Amino acid sequence: MPSCAGLAVPYVPFQQDAPKKYAQSEALSNGTLFPGLNLPFHLKTEGSSLPSTPLTELQALEFVLLELGIYLDTHPDDAEAFTLFKQYAAMEKAAKAAYESKFGPLTKSAAASGERYSWLQEPWPWNYEQNEVK
């Protein structure tokens, strides 16, 4: 980090094309897909480890999609990032369909696709740990 970038003063480095990327679960834990943007504010803390559940895996995929979308907003000509975005979009779509078929709908609009309205049925998505209800 440049010496002119004080920790209490907002500073965001310019992203270069094809920046390094965290793995999806590590990105979710650190709050950014890009290690170059993982800057300290006062004290640097390492990302916490999240439990490995189907829901956190889906959340990690969705987080990476959001981060890549923001990156592509400022780098629309980065073909490698766009290819990666399309790959993650397909992975997220498949993971969401698999999750909802096993555990039930994640959104109210998904509850409309079943045989009957199933939004308020327990267990809730956050009550699952490693495919079992806690």
Predicted feature locations:
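Long, non-catalytic architectural segments outside compact domain cores
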Residues: 1-49, 53, 103-134
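Non-transmembrane amphipathic alpha-helical segments
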Residues: 54, 58-72, 88, 92-95
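Short, charged, amphipathic alpha-helical segments
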Residues: 79-89, 113
